[in-house]
Structure formats: C-alpha cells, structure tokens
C-alpha cells in the first residue's frame, strides 16, 4: 500500500483502453476507396469464400473490410463507407462495409433484416 506522500509525488496510473477499430479515429463510419476486391478463406474449422475488400480511407489508413450479404457490386475504385465490427474467422479483418450507401448496393431480394443490408422495403 502506497503512503499519501508517495501518491502525491507519483499518482496512480490510469489504464488506457486500446481501440478495437483504430482506423475510424473515434468516428462511427469512414469513407474510403476500394484498392482491391477479393475472396479469402476463413480459419479452421470453417470453410467458405468470404468476400473482402482492401480500402484506402480518407484519413490515410488502409484496412481490410468484409462485404456482408449475398452478392455485391464492388470493384476497384468503388467509394465505400466502412464501420467497425470484426469477422471472427478472418484474421486481420476488423471492419465491415455498409451496404446500401455510396457505391455499395443493397442486397437484392432480402426480406428480413433489411436495414443491415441496405435493402428498400418491398412494395
């Protein structure tokens, strides 16, 4: 136990919390340009071809971002909005692209959970 004199001389250190999404710099979303759109395979025990894009953000960061939903229209030089949220079985992918904003289209034929995939309400 420290004495009061010791604490006056050198106060207790506050533990600093490290951000899970440093490239967003405390913003809810960030805009960026796709530099590469590709598929990659997940860690064991899962098996799939996950759609991922490499994005150069407006603040200079370059990050990998997951493209959720079935089918997408992204290619190189597409302007996308990314949000935080990692993909557990893809190492190094800590961001998601926001569907239905900027150059990213919503998911076609989606009826449930539409707001997460940028799909308009069916007539």
Curated annotation (Swiss-Prot):
The modification 3-methylthioaspartic acid is found at residue 89. One of its GO terms (molecular function) is rRNA binding. It comes from the Bacteria. Residues 1-22, 100-123 are annotated as: Disordered. The keyword Transmembrane does not apply. SUPFAM superfamilies: Nucleic acid-binding proteins. One of its GO terms (cellular component) is small ribosomal subunit. The keyword Cytoplasm does not apply. Signal peptide: none annotated. InterPro entries: NA-bd_OB-fold (IPR012340), Ribosomal_uS12 (IPR006032), Ribosomal_uS12_bac (IPR005679). GO terms for biological process: translation. Keywords: Methylation, Ribonucleoprotein, Ribosomal protein, RNA-binding, rRNA-binding, tRNA-binding. Residues 111-123 have a biased composition (Basic residues). Part of the 30S ribosomal subunit. Contacts proteins S8 and S17. May interact with IF1 in the 30S initiation complex. PANTHER family: 30S RIBOSOMAL PROTEIN S12 FAMILY MEMBER (PTHR11652). Belongs to the universal ribosomal protein uS12 family. With S4 and S5 plays an important role in translational accuracy. NCBIfam families: rpsL_bact. This is Small ribosomal subunit protein uS12. It comes from Pseudomonas putida (strain ATCC 47054 / DSM 6125 / CFBP 8728 / NCIMB 11950 / KT2440).
